Amino acid sequence: MLEVVTVRIPRRFGFHPIRDIQVLTPMNRGGLGAHALNEDLRGRLNAAAEPRLTRFGSTFAPGDKVIQMVNNYDREVFNGDIGFVREIDLEEGRMNMDFDGRCVTCEFGELDEVSLAYAVSIHKSQGSEYPVVVIPLVMQHYTLLERNLLYTAITRGKKLVVIVGQPRALALAVRNRRASRRITGLAQRLRTFKAGSEENH
């Protein structure tokens, strides 16, 4: 999965691994949860950045991709906004971030409002769109594998969507209509996509 995000998609399609590619995962915890994937992806994409700052269980460095976790009307950044760490000022106790070309400054004591965003939960991605979405699906996530969650993840991608994982987990997600019956045609679209991709290989 890490190689798909950091090497294969950028090399084959020309997308930037940090700016363009968003990993969306069903869970926050576990080996393929957002927390572990954020550390793994940062290790591949931004390992050498300094200085590093750890607050509220998260470590930040210049160049890191971050997500705003709550609405902050004073700073005009809102839940789900994606930005990038510009600078960490250890003397002043502030971290400067770039949200859509706008500099937003956060005091170290307020960094519980921000989290790493190389990978985010599918739930957290609702309402957002990204050029490329990569979705890890494994049976470890079985309690959350539902058709509406898969639909949400797939529809976040504007140009390319890549599902990485176990076919059994994908089949379970497509079959499982526990939460909603309003989504139609997803199973057929995935079968058509799979048939088309097999013909191209």
Residue spans of the language-model regions?
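C-terminal accessory regions
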Residues: 79-201
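Conserved helicase motor core of P-loop NTPases
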Residues: 1-75, 86, 95
